[in-house]
Amino acid sequence: MRAIYDYIIYTDGGCERNPGGRGGYGAVIINNSTGELTDISGGFRSTTNNRMEVMAVIKALEKIEKGTHIQLFSDSQYVIKTMNGMFRKKKNIDLWKKLDKLAVAFEIEWNWVKGHNGNTYNEKCDTLCQEAMTLPELEEDVGYMNTDSVPEQSDTVAQSLEKYNMYPDCSDVESYQEKYLVNPI
Protein backbone atom coordinates (compact mmCIF):
# COMPACT_ATOMS: atom_id res chain seq x y z
CA MET A 1 0.00 0.00 0.00
CA ARG A 2 1.36 3.40 -1.03
CA ALA A 3 1.91 6.00 1.70
CA ILE A 4 -0.01 9.26 1.41
CA TYR A 5 3.28 11.17 1.34
CA ASP A 6 6.43 9.81 -0.26
CA TYR A 7 8.56 11.94 2.07
CA ILE A 8 8.14 13.92 5.25
CA ILE A 9 10.65 16.75 5.70
CA TYR A 10 11.47 18.85 8.75
CA THR A 11 13.71 21.91 8.37
CA ASP A 12 15.31 24.57 10.53
CA GLY A 13 17.78 27.39 10.11
CA GLY A 14 19.44 29.88 12.40
CA CYS A 15 22.15 32.44 12.87
CA GLU A 16 24.23 33.09 15.99
CA ARG A 17 24.28 36.85 15.42
CA ASN A 18 21.57 38.09 13.13
CA PRO A 19 22.21 39.61 10.65
CA GLY A 20 25.72 38.87 9.47
CA GLY A 21 26.75 36.12 11.85
CA ARG A 22 27.60 32.48 11.40
CA GLY A 23 24.54 30.55 10.33
CA GLY A 24 23.46 26.98 9.88
CA TYR A 25 20.64 24.92 8.44
CA GLY A 26 19.41 21.44 9.16
CA ALA A 27 16.85 19.09 7.66
CA VAL A 28 15.56 15.63 8.36
CA ILE A 29 14.09 13.71 5.43
CA ILE A 30 11.92 10.70 6.22
CA ASN A 31 11.30 8.23 3.40
CA ASN A 32 7.74 7.22 4.19
CA SER A 33 8.01 3.92 2.29
CA THR A 34 11.19 2.63 3.92
CA GLY A 35 11.33 4.62 7.15
CA GLU A 36 14.90 5.66 6.28
CA LEU A 37 16.02 8.97 7.80
CA THR A 38 18.46 11.31 6.07
CA ASP A 39 20.04 14.25 7.89
CA ILE A 40 21.28 17.29 5.97
CA SER A 41 23.16 20.24 7.40
CA GLY A 42 25.53 23.01 6.45
CA GLY A 43 26.47 26.52 7.34
CA PHE A 44 27.86 29.86 6.23
CA ARG A 45 30.22 32.41 7.75
CA SER A 46 28.09 35.50 7.23
CA THR A 47 24.35 35.20 6.69
CA THR A 48 20.92 35.68 8.29
CA ASN A 49 18.51 33.37 10.09
CA ASN A 50 15.87 33.79 7.37
CA ARG A 51 18.35 32.86 4.64
CA MET A 52 19.21 29.71 6.57
CA GLU A 53 15.52 28.82 7.02
CA VAL A 54 14.97 29.02 3.25
CA MET A 55 18.29 27.27 2.53
CA ALA A 56 17.24 24.31 4.71
CA VAL A 57 14.16 23.76 2.54
CA ILE A 58 16.15 24.11 -0.69
CA LYS A 59 18.84 21.64 0.39
CA ALA A 60 16.22 19.11 1.48
CA LEU A 61 14.25 19.35 -1.78
CA GLU A 62 17.46 18.96 -3.80
CA LYS A 63 17.83 15.48 -2.27
CA ILE A 64 14.32 14.31 -3.17
CA GLU A 65 13.16 12.62 -6.37
CA LYS A 66 11.11 15.01 -8.51
CA GLY A 67 7.40 14.35 -8.85
CA THR A 68 6.99 12.99 -5.34
CA HIS A 69 4.44 14.01 -2.73
CA ILE A 70 5.99 15.74 0.29
CA GLN A 71 4.72 16.85 3.67
CA LEU A 72 7.08 19.60 4.83
CA PHE A 73 7.31 21.07 8.34
CA SER A 74 9.17 24.26 9.22
CA ASP A 75 9.18 26.33 12.39
CA SER A 76 9.77 29.39 10.21
CA GLN A 77 6.66 31.48 9.68
CA TYR A 78 8.81 33.43 7.19
CA VAL A 79 9.04 30.32 4.99
CA ILE A 80 5.48 29.06 5.44
CA LYS A 81 3.76 32.45 5.14
CA THR A 82 5.84 33.37 2.09
CA MET A 83 5.03 30.09 0.37
CA ASN A 84 1.32 30.53 1.09
CA GLY A 85 1.35 34.08 -0.28
CA MET A 86 0.91 35.98 2.99
CA PHE A 87 4.40 37.57 2.83
CA ARG A 88 5.96 39.13 -0.26
CA LYS A 89 9.34 38.00 -1.47
CA LYS A 90 11.24 41.24 -0.86
CA LYS A 91 14.52 39.91 0.51
CA ASN A 92 16.60 36.84 -0.29
CA ILE A 93 15.28 36.80 -3.85
CA ASP A 94 18.11 34.51 -4.99
CA LEU A 95 16.90 31.82 -2.58
CA TRP A 96 13.19 32.33 -3.26
CA LYS A 97 13.81 31.89 -6.99
CA LYS A 98 15.64 28.62 -6.30
CA LEU A 99 12.91 27.42 -3.98
CA ASP A 100 10.11 28.33 -6.40
CA LYS A 101 11.90 26.49 -9.22
CA LEU A 102 12.31 23.40 -7.02
CA ALA A 103 8.83 23.48 -5.49
CA VAL A 104 6.96 23.20 -8.79
CA ALA A 105 8.55 19.77 -9.35
CA PHE A 106 6.76 18.33 -6.30
CA GLU A 107 3.41 18.15 -4.59
CA ILE A 108 4.22 19.86 -1.29
CA GLU A 109 1.99 20.32 1.71
CA TRP A 110 3.50 23.20 3.72
CA ASN A 111 3.05 23.05 7.51
CA TRP A 112 4.19 25.23 10.37
CA VAL A 113 5.44 23.52 13.53
CA LYS A 114 6.13 25.37 16.75
CA GLY A 115 9.88 25.42 17.39
CA HIS A 116 11.50 24.31 20.65
CA ASN A 117 8.31 22.58 21.70
CA GLY A 118 9.45 18.98 22.01
CA ASN A 119 8.82 17.81 18.43
CA THR A 120 11.52 15.17 17.92
CA TYR A 121 12.32 15.99 14.31
CA ASN A 122 12.18 19.76 14.76
CA GLU A 123 14.56 19.44 17.71
CA LYS A 124 16.88 17.25 15.60
CA CYS A 125 16.90 19.93 12.87
CA ASP A 126 17.72 22.57 15.46
CA THR A 127 20.65 20.47 16.72
CA LEU A 128 21.93 19.96 13.15
CA CYS A 129 21.65 23.71 12.55
CA GLN A 130 23.49 24.62 15.77
CA GLU A 131 26.27 22.11 15.08
CA ALA A 132 26.68 23.31 11.48
CA MET A 133 27.19 26.95 12.45
CA THR A 134 30.09 25.99 14.74
CA LEU A 135 32.09 24.20 12.03
CA PRO A 136 35.55 25.76 11.65
CA GLU A 137 35.55 26.08 7.84
CA LEU A 138 32.36 27.77 6.71
CA GLU A 139 31.84 29.26 3.25
CA GLU A 140 30.75 32.85 2.71
CA ASP A 141 27.05 33.14 1.81
CA VAL A 142 27.57 34.92 -1.51
CA GLY A 143 23.85 35.72 -1.80
CA TYR A 144 23.85 37.54 1.50
CA MET A 145 24.26 41.27 1.27
CA ASN A 146 24.50 43.25 4.49
CA THR A 147 22.10 46.13 3.86
CA ASP A 148 24.03 48.35 6.29
CA SER A 149 26.85 48.56 3.75
CA VAL A 150 24.64 49.29 0.73
CA PRO A 151 24.76 52.92 -0.42
CA GLU A 152 21.50 54.86 -0.55
CA GLN A 153 19.54 54.27 -3.74
CA SER A 154 17.30 56.77 -5.48
CA ASP A 155 14.65 54.14 -6.31
CA THR A 156 11.76 53.64 -3.93
CA VAL A 157 11.13 50.10 -2.73
CA ALA A 158 8.20 49.80 -5.13
CA GLN A 159 10.36 50.98 -8.05
CA SER A 160 13.08 48.48 -7.16
CA LEU A 161 10.60 45.63 -6.89
CA GLU A 162 9.12 46.60 -10.25
CA LYS A 163 12.53 47.03 -11.90
CA TYR A 164 13.86 43.68 -10.77
CA ASN A 165 10.57 41.83 -11.15
CA MET A 166 10.63 40.81 -7.50
CA TYR A 167 6.90 40.42 -7.00
CA PRO A 168 5.92 36.79 -6.45
CA ASP A 169 3.32 35.03 -8.55
CA CYS A 170 1.04 34.76 -5.51
CA SER A 171 -1.31 37.71 -5.86
CA ASP A 172 -4.22 35.26 -5.86
CA VAL A 173 -3.63 33.63 -2.47
CA GLU A 174 -6.20 30.86 -2.94
CA SER A 175 -4.74 29.64 -6.24
CA TYR A 176 -1.21 29.91 -4.79
CA GLN A 177 -2.27 27.84 -1.78
CA GLU A 178 -3.84 25.27 -4.07
CA LYS A 179 -0.80 25.19 -6.39
CA TYR A 180 1.63 24.61 -3.52
CA LEU A 181 -0.80 22.66 -1.28
CA VAL A 182 -0.34 25.16 1.52
CA ASN A 183 -2.20 24.77 4.79
CA PRO A 184 -3.11 28.24 6.06
CA ILE A 185 -1.60 29.11 9.42
Label the model's feature ranges.
Residues 1-51, 62-64, 68, 126, ...:
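RNase H-like nuclease fold core
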Residues 5-8, 14-19, 55-148:
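RNase H catalytic domain
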Residues 87, 162-165:
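Charged/polar, low-hydrophobicity segments characteristic of intrinsically disordered regions
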Residues 113, 154-156, 171, 185:
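N-terminal cationic amphipathic segment used for targeting or macromolecule association
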Residues 152, 156-163:
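Intrinsically disordered, low-complexity regulatory segments in eukaryotic proteins
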